[in-house]
Amino acid sequence: INLVNIVFIKLLEVYMIPVDDKSQFGSYEANQVVALIIKITRSLGSKWISKRLIFILRRIAIYFSKQCLDTVLFDSNLRLYTKGNVSEKRALFSPQIFEEEERNFIASRASDNSIFIDIGANVGLYSFSVSQKYKLFENTKIFALEPHPDLFKRLLFNQNLNSHLPIFPKRIAIMHKPGEFFLNTPKENLGQGKISQKGELKVEGLPLSNFAEIEGIKKISAIKIDVEGNEEKVLLPFIIEENRSLF
C-alpha cells in the first residue's frame, strides 16, 4: 500500500463514523472548552465577519470533540455528529444562521391538524426546529423522510429522545415514480446523497401523492424539500389538478 492509499484510508476513517444509537443521552457531553466555544458561536450574528469567526472556532471545537456531541438545540435533546455531515455541524455551532427565515415560515403554518412533510430530512433539523410550535396544536404531524440508513438511525435516535414531539420518521426517498433506486453519497458529507440508477445503497422510492395516500393525508400545510437538485423532478408530478385538494 503506497502513501496515497494510506492517507485516503485514514481520511475515510475520519468520515465513516459509526452511529451510536445505544448509549444514553449525555454520554457525549461537551468538555469545558467545546461547551464555551458553542456558547460563543451560537451568540454571534450572521454578518461575514461573524461567519468567519464561527468557522474558525468550530474547527477548533471539532478538533477537541468526540465523534458526536449531546446538546440541547431547538428546545430538544439532540445527538449531533461533528464530522461527515455539514448540516449537523452548522446547526450544532450556529443554529441562528441555519436557514432561519425558512424555518420560521414553516413554523408559522402550524395550526390544528397541520401536516408538515420534511423531504430529505437528514437528521431532522428542520423537523425539530419547528416541532415546538406544532406540538402546541391538536392532531399535528411532522413527517421526516430520509432514505440514508445512517442518517435515518441518527434521526430515529433523536426522535426517541423527544418522543413527546409530533415527529414521525420514515426511511423513504420521495421520487417521481415508485420503485427501488440507488443512493450515492460522498463520505465527507452524508447529507449530499444523490439518487441514481446504480450505486452503493439501495433505497425505496415513492411519489409524494402515493405517500400522502398511504398516510391518509388530506391536506399538507408545508413542505421542505432538499434532494440535491432533484426537486423539480419530485414535485412537478405532484403539483397537478387532481392533487389540488392536498395543497
Question: Which ranges hold each PLM region?
Answer:
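Phosphate/nucleotide-binding beta-alpha loop and adjacent structural elements of enzyme active sites
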Residues: 5-247
